[in-house]
């Protein structure tokens, strides 16, 4: 019997829908718990396993929405961790099933419906913990398939994102949000639920109140933005040019510019993001801008070095006459692979740089030699947690810490982002042990059997992890800016007239060497 015809599963799905209609949190929680337990009998049958987890995930999500009012408790955090586990495990199981199984058109329709639903709700979950760029990145991929709910939810995410944005992109983000929401309203009720449409319309109504607001006065329309990305079929090999670099940056959403979260078209002036106004003493007026300059420069340099290492296949003169032994396992050596590693290390170092910034900005009191991105969250009495309630951007940084260092309240490490945790593992091996990169072009012949000292990884996986690491750093940098802006607005909202603004001019490109 096909998994999508399983009567037991269909019956549980019906019960979950009925419990939601009745707003019965106890039944939703019981269904979620029961199906999570039942799913363990089907781990080898990937779609049955995913289907059980899908119903468990949606039931638990609905339970949280109905039952849990206080989002600053350990109980809420444990429930979110469990939801993340159910969603991520279901998505991974479906991805593996699609990779290993040939399916017919009917099965694809059923699978695609479940996959889109899980991914959409997963992105909504990321929004609830402050990881806006991550959520938008994943939701945008769904929206390019013209899935109506994803288009509408992407619109709400961009709307919320714009509310936090203090840069010149704010109005453009609102316009793109409007277009997405308006597009979602054109779908039939069977595709976009009437309740969802009402919610989308409420956002549109808010935007319609803005004076002189023309939502369709944008450089690109939503239809062109949601086309399949060009990078899928683009070959950058031996083509290291300014134009190609910025194409790569834009289409991987790596620019320090909030518009790049929705708009993947390459532009000039990509990296325009900087800190907002900060209240500080006149004798210390530029310190935070100075450290942010350093964070930003290191990010942009690491990003380019990664690109160059990935796409420059030319031999470099510095590799000539460097005698190496052929170990018969197809390793990769040379300046380009070392560029990728260097970019990886440099990007990873930004976590601690950001931790140093937060320690000084929030006056957490950690000694300079003890500060790290990990340690600023570890003290139970740490003042940084007092800021959480009114600063969702800071909460997004906290959840990145949880994924990176496998820190959970429930002690269930299966809820963490496996790719980010893998990023952490590879960095530690690269830094403290012995990482051997095997050539993905010869993956069938490559083997680690001949080298029991090495921890091996393919060049393709290292590149993929490198891009993901850069993207996570980008999100943290944006969240850092939002965190500061939210905090400055909270502490200054009643006393703005008492302060004098001091202008800081741009550091010219001509001065950079």
Regions found by a protein language model. Give the residues of each.
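Short coil/linker segments at helix-helix boundaries
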Residues: 63-83, 163-177, 319-327
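Amphipathic, Lys/Arg-enriched alpha-helical patches that create a basic surface
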Residues: 420-426, 444-513
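Amphipathic alpha-helical repeat scaffolds of TPR domains
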Residues: 2-21, 44-72, 95, 107-125, ...
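Long, charged low-complexity segments
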Residues: 243-279, 381-447
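Charged alpha-helical initiation segments
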Residues: 2-15, 217-340, 498-502
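Helix-turn-helix repeat elements of alpha-solenoid scaffolds
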Residues: 20-40, 73-101, 126-139, 171-181
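Structural signature of alpha-solenoid helical repeat scaffolds
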Residues: 4, 44, 75, 103-106, ...
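Short non-catalytic regulatory patches outside canonical folded cores
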Residues: 325-423, 432-433
